[in-house]
Amino acid sequence: MATKDPTAVERANLLNMAKLSIKGLIESALSFGRTLDSDYPPLQQFFVVMEHCLKHGLKVRKSFLSYNKTIWGPLELVEKLYPEAEEIGASVRDLPGLKTPLGRARAWLRLALMQKKMADYLRCLIIQRDLLSEFYEYHALMMEEEGAVIVGLLVGLNVIDANLCVKGEDLDSQVGVIDFSMYLKNEEDIGNKERNVQIAAILDQKNYVEELNRQLNSTVSSLHSRVDSLEKSNTKLIEELAIAKNNIIKLQEENHQLRSENKLILMKTQQHLEVTKVDVETELQTYKHSRQGLDEMYNEARRQLRDESQLRQDVENELAVQVSMKHEIELAMKLLEKDIHEKQDTLIGLRQQLEEVKAINIEMYQKLQGSEDGLKEKNEIIARLEEKTNKITAAMRQLEQRLQQAEKAQMEAEDEDEKYLQECLSKSDSLQKQISQKEKQLVQLETDLKIEKEWRQTLQEDLQKEKDALSHLRNETQQIISLKKEFLNLQDENQQLKKIYHEQEQALQELGNKLSESKLKIEDIKEANKALQGLVWLKDKEATHCKLCEKEFSLSKRKHHCRNCGEIFCNACSDNELPLPSSPKPVRVCDSCHALLIQRCSSNLP
């Protein structure tokens, strides 16, 4: 018989132990049906077996004080090969209770199992055999095919959910000893397994009832909280409605106040307009009276000019008669020429004054064109005055033409006037008197023109005052327009508030309907909870006959639990599936519970 390699036998033993521990851990975890913690015995034995597998063939490292043989070195190498493992390494180093490398390695294995990536991490490590040769001997388990087989078996552990507390455990001082009694089967173990199965069934029933109660309590509490929140929102909406109604009342009062103020402002403006109209009419009447006085003065001036023209004609006739008195007439004519030159100067001054009057009238006409309809009569009066002034200028031009004709006649009659000089001397005195009278009349005309200028200045001041009053009235009208705009804005806001009020009333009605529906649902849930609290999960041993058809159970007629009432029925009487509050997936329900649940669902539907 050839002797076997002891290292190969060790690898085979460790591989078989790893298979048994992984298989037993998966089967026990699936039958246990809950997340595993650190006190679970199969899980503890799994970590012990993995520790032995990783320690097999590990090289011894020398230090100053002692020899060091630990698995933390190759596990720490995983961070460089697999970047996602950096988080585990950092968290292991940050743990406060770990002092030895072995404790860090044990914590690393537990964290890798919780992340369900232990197989991935160790696969990356096995592939890099040149790096592993620094830590392991050539005949080590991690360097041979058995290591790859163990890594493949570790993939099955991804089915398990584990919640391990690493901080509180003393991982440095634990002794890793494999308990072989867990993997050896006896008759007592078989009896214990049956007991464990019964205990597990009882625990499942208990957990099922507890979950039912917990879910029902949570639904009831959530519905209570919803009812409270809806009541609070209802009270808030009622308060907001009251506030909105108060705001609407205030806005209506402000609206009435603004309307009354608007009416008062309109009354005041109308009164002010009437007063201004009366003032304008009185001023126009005074203006008309003053214009009538001016017309009379202009008529008197025309009469005087006519008299002068007649006197000129008489003088011409007398000059024609008095040709013999030429020498005396020459002296008189020189005097007359001087007087004529003076009169021409005065006429030029009068022309300038008339031009000034024209310019003033034009300016007044342009200013009066910018005023409103109430000042049209003044513009017509000014137009009449301009026509009168034009007539006066035309008459003055005619007088100038006549004077020129008289001068020509005088030049022609110089030869004939020598005969009548003596007679003219006697009449020259009378002419001088007439000239002095005319000079007095000219002085009176100048004073009249000054009075007219002053009167025009007063008219301009009155017009300026009227313009100021018009601008003031325009400002008041603009204020009234702005008040109207504000009033319209307030009306729009009032309409918007009314819309919000109606929308809030509709929302309150909808909330009331929803509250009534939720109250009905709460009552249904309370009734269901009361009915479920009285139900008990019936044991298999207690039931020998079906509750509905009362047929005896046998090998062919199996027992089935109803997940709603907990009673036991045959397959024919419980061949129904419905989703329950305890489980979202459809579960087995008896015929009576099926009919009751369908009736309840149909009644809850709108």
From Swiss-Prot:
Keywords in alphabetical order: Coiled coil, Metal-binding, Nucleus, Zinc, Zinc-finger
Xref: SUPFAM superfamilies: FYVE/PHD zinc finger (SSF57903), RUN domain-like (SSF140741)
Zinc finger map (FYVE-type): 540-598
Signal peptide, first to last residue: none
Quaternary structure and interacting proteins, as annotated: Interacts with BMX.
Lineage: Eukaryota, Metazoa, Chordata, Craniata, Vertebrata
Annotated InterPro entries: FYVE_RUFY2 (IPR047333), RUFY1-3 (IPR047335), Run_dom (IPR004012), Run_dom_sf (IPR037213), RUN_RUFY2 (IPR047332), Znf_FYVE (IPR000306), Znf_FYVE-rel (IPR017455), Znf_FYVE_PHD (IPR011011)
Residues where Zn(2+) 1 binds: 546, 549, 570, 573
Residues given in the record as Zn(2+) 2 binding sites: 562, 565, 590, 593
Record-annotated RUN domain positions: 37-169
Expression sites by tissue: Expressed in brain, lung and testis.
Protein name: RUN and FYVE domain-containing protein 2
Annotated compartments: Nucleus
GO molecular function: SH3 domain binding; zinc ion binding
Originating species: Homo sapiens
GO terms for biological process, alphabetical: regulation of endocytosis
Cellular compartments per GO CC: cytoplasm; endosome; nucleus
Gene behind this protein: RUFY2
Coiled-coil stretches: 210-534
